[in-house]
UniProtKB/Swiss-Prot annotation:
Primary site of residence: cytoplasm
InterPro entries on file: CoA-bd (IPR003781), NAD(P)-bd_dom_sf (IPR036291), Rex_DNA-bd_C_dom (IPR009718), Tscrpt_rep_Rex (IPR022876), WH-like_DNA-bd_sf (IPR036388), WH_DNA-bd_sf (IPR036390)
Similarity comment: family membership: Belongs to the transcriptional regulatory Rex family.
One GO term (biological process): response to redox state
Domain of life of the native organism: Bacteria
Function summary: Modulates transcription in response to changes in cellular NADH/NAD(+) redox state.
Protein name: Redox-sensing transcriptional repressor Rex
Protein source organism: Geobacillus kaustophilus (strain HTA426)
Coiled coil stretches, renumbered: none
The protein's assembly and partners: Homodimer.
SUPFAM superfamilies with a match to the protein in the record: NAD(P)-binding Rossmann-fold domains, Winged helix' DNA-binding domain
Protein residues bound to NAD(+): 92-97
Any GO molecular function: DNA-binding transcription factor activity
Subcellular location: Cytoplasm
Length: 213
């Protein structure tokens, strides 16, 4: 996000893309304005939290009127720097990695996987979803400073050694889909997404906190 934007809580920052996606859908449907209650129902965030999130950016709406969809959409596009494409490198072209390459964030205008790496000779030299696949040995040669983000879908045992190489190459952010908990310098941001843990958590809540009928 732009350095000119006010410092906001990380929890709020994580919700901004969610708001933006919903606003794009509203705009596409021709809706001109939306209330915090309508936003709340759509994104499953309570209205008070939405109003507080929006308050960090000043007066985005009017009491009794709600929010102008076109204005909010334009505002969040600038805030999220939607007009600037962030290039991403993917590591590990297995089932999950292949799915990412075929999808390649088609709903996001500002994120694009531009290269992938693997050690499987059958995959090296091919393209998946239009993205070239290189051998992991070529990492230092291929990865450049214009690619600040890496997605890891490699075996857990290989994750830390790969991360160490990425740090040396100047990667600034890592989306980690491996079970490994990565050690990185303080200036590197890592988001861990462990699908097995998320599934276990969901099953636990279903069993122990059933929704009211």
């Amino acid at each position: 996000m732009s350095n000119e934007q006010p410092k906001i809580p990380q929890a709020t920052a994580k919700r901004l893309p969610l708001y933006y996606r919903f606003l794009k859908n509203l705009h596409a449907s021709g809706k001109q304005r939306v209330s915090s209650a309508e936003l709340s129902e759509a994104v499953k965030v309570d209205p008070a939290t939405i109003r507080r999130d929006f308050s960090y950016f000043g007066a985005l709406g009017k009491k009794g009127y709600g929010y102008n969809v076109n204005y909010l959409l334009s505002f969040f596009r600038r805030t999220l720097e939607e007009d600037e494409v962030t290039e991403v490198a993917l590591f590990g072209v297995g089932n999950l990695g292949t799915a990412f390459l075929n999808y390649n964030f088609s709903k996001n205008n500002n994120t694009k996987i531009v290269m992938a790496f693997d050690v499987d000779e059958r995959k090296v030299g091919t393209t998946v979803g239009g993205v070239p696949v290189y051998h992991l040995d070529e990492l230092e040669e291929r990865l450049h400073e214009n690619i600040p983000v890496a997605i890891l879908t490699v075996p857990a045992a290989a994750a830390q050694a790969l991360t160490d190489r990425l740090v040396v190459q100047g990667i600034k952010g890592i989306l980690n889909f491996t079970p490994a908990r990565l050690n990185v310098p303080n200036h590197i941001r890592v988001h861990h997404i462990d699908l097995a843990i998320e599934l276990q958590s969901l099953v636990y809540f279903l069993k122990n906190y059933p929704s009211p009928s």
